[in-house]
C-alpha cells in the first residue's frame, strides 16, 4: 500500500500514455492500446504488450485504441487502461488517492473534458485537473510562459495537432486539428495501395514513417524493405520504398497542418507575431520527429523553427512541472490552461 499520495501528471495521447510522478519525472511511456477478450469482456493486456497483439489476435481477442483523434472514443476501456497504468506507477492507493493533471487537446469540448475527468476519477484519482497540450508542451520545452512575450508551439501528437500562441500563461490564439501521426500512417496505407497494390499493417506503417518518412527533400534518399500483402494475388510481397515516395504520401496531411499554422499566425495580434519572429516556433510531440518538419515550417513561414529537446516527453514534462501549482488552485478549478496560475 502506498503510504503517501503522489501528485501525477498524465499525457493521455491517442498513440501513447506518459505518466509523470512528482519528484521522479516520467516513469511510464506505453502505447494507448488495450487487449480484451470479446466473449468475457476481460482486460488481458495494456500498453506495449497489447500493442504487440495488434493485427495478430485470434477471433475472441481484440486489441483496440480507446482514444481517437485526441479524445476518448471508448470510455470504459480508457478508464480501465488508466487504472492499470496508475496501479503500475503508484501501486495500491485505495486510501491515498493521487491528484492528477491530464493533458487534453486545445479544441476539446466541455462534454469531452467531462469524460476525461470522470475517467480519471473512476480510475482512482482523488481529484482531476486538465491542462491543454500546447501549454504543457511549452512548459516542458523550457519556455517561460508567464512573461508578456509571445511564443508559438506546434504540438503534433498521434491524433491531433495543436498550434497555440501563448503569452502571460494563457493561450492567446490556437487551433486543434485532427491531423497528426495517425493520419500520416493512414496516408501511408493509401499510398501503398494506390502505388504498389500492397496492403501493409499498422506497425509496418509506423516503421516506415519513422525510418524513411520525410516532409522536406532529403540530401540523400533513403529506402526501406517492407513486407505486405499483394492486393492482386493475395500473397506476401516484399518491396523497397524510398523517402521520396513518403514526400508524396504525406503531402495532404502536411498541407493541412501548415494551413492551421498560417491561420493561427493570421489571427494573432501583430505585437505577438513580432515576438514569435524573434523567439521562433517550437515543435513538440512524436509527429515533430518526422524528418524535415522544422525545415518545412521555417521555409513556409519565414520564422526560425526548432524541434524541442526530447520532443516526445515535453507534454508529460510540462504537465509534471504544473503539479507545483495545484496547491494554489481554487475550488472548482478544472482546466488550468484557462486560469493564469501556471507561474
Q: What is the role of each PLM region?
A:
Residues 1-156, 164-281, 288-343:
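Nucleotide/phosphate-binding catalytic cleft detector across ATP-hydrolyzing
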Amino acid at each position: 500500500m502506498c503510504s503517501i499520495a503522489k501528485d501525477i501528471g498524465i499525457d493521455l495521447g491517442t498513440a501513447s500514455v506518459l505518466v509523470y510522478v512528482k519528484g521522479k519525472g516520467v516513469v511510464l511511456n506505453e502505447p494507448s492500446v488495450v487487449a480484451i477478450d470479446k466473449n468475457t469482456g476481460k482486460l488481458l493486456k495494456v500498453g506495449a504488450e497489447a500493442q504487440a497483439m495488434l493485427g495478430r489476435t485470434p477471433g475472441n481477442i481484440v486489441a483496440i485504441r480507446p482514444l481517437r483523434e485526441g479524445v476518448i472514443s471508448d470510455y470504459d476501456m480508457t478508464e480501465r487502461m488508466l487504472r492499470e497504468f496508475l496501479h503500475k506507477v503508484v501501486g495500491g492507493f485505495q486510501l491515498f488517492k493521487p491528484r492528477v493533471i491530464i493533458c487534453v487537446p486545445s479544441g476539446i469540448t466541455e462534454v469531452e473534458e467531462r469524460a476525461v475527468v470522470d475517467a480519471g476519477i473512476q480510475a482512482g484519482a482523488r481529484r482531476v485537473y486538465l491542462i491543454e497540450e500546447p501549454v504543457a508542451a511549452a512548459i516542458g520545452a523550457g519556455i517561460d510562459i508567464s512573461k508578456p512575450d509571445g511564443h508559438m508551439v506546434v504540438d503534433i501528437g498521434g491524433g491531433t495537432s495543436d498550434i497555440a500562441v501563448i503569452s502571460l500563461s494563457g493561450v492567446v490564439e490556437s487551433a486543434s486539428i485532427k491531423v497528426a501521426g495517425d493520419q500520416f500512417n493512414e496516408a501511408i496505407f493509401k499510398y501503398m495501395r494506390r502505388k504498389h497494390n500492397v496492403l501493409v499493417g499498422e506497425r509496418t506503417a509506423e516503421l516506415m514513417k519513422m525510418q524513411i518518412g520525410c516532409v522536406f527533400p532529403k540530401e540523400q534518399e533513403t529506402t526501406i524493405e517492407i513486407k505486405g500483402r499483394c492486393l492482386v494475388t493475395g500473397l506476401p510481397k516484399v518491396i523497397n520504398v524510398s523517402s521520396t515516395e513518403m514526400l508524396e504520401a504525406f503531402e495532404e496531411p502536411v498541407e493541412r497542418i501548415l494551413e492551421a499554422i498560417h491561420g493561427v499566425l493570421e489571427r494573432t495580434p501583430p505585437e505577438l507575431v513580432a515576438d514569435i519572429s524573434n523567439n521562433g516556433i517550437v515543435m513538440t510531440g512524436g509527429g515533430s520527429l518526422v524528418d524535415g518538419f522544422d525545415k518545412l515550417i521555417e521555409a513556409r513561414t519565414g520564422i526560425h523553427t526548432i524541434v524541442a529537446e526530447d520532443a516526445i516527453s515535453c507534454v508529460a514534462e510540462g504537465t509534471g512541472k504544473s503539479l507545483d501549482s495545484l496547491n494554489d488552485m481554487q475550488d472548482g478549478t478544472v482546466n488550468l490552461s484557462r486560469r493564469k496560475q501556471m507561474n
